[in-house]
């Protein structure tokens, strides 16, 4: 089964399962949030679903409630960190800069950001 094999080899699935340690800042039955190992801003954490989803490109209708929960968790965690302005980033596919094939959202804050991002 491809899904099972992907999740067994996935570093984010291993973090979600507690097999790899992380600086967890939030966790519930559906998702986990943890500080980025290589922060690009004073505050930089990732929010991921525990379910293995490769990227936004592989979502289906059954994932809509999960995605809403992730967005609400991002809102709460930003407020918990007193972020009035922040950036949420997800990369899709290799050309989009995705390096871990598990859907994840970077939340960056604590400094001013500019556009274009590059």
Where are the regions a protein language model picked out?
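Glycine-rich phosphate/oxyanion-binding loops and their immediately adjacent helices
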Residues: 1
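HIT superfamily nucleotide-processing domains
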Residues: 4-118
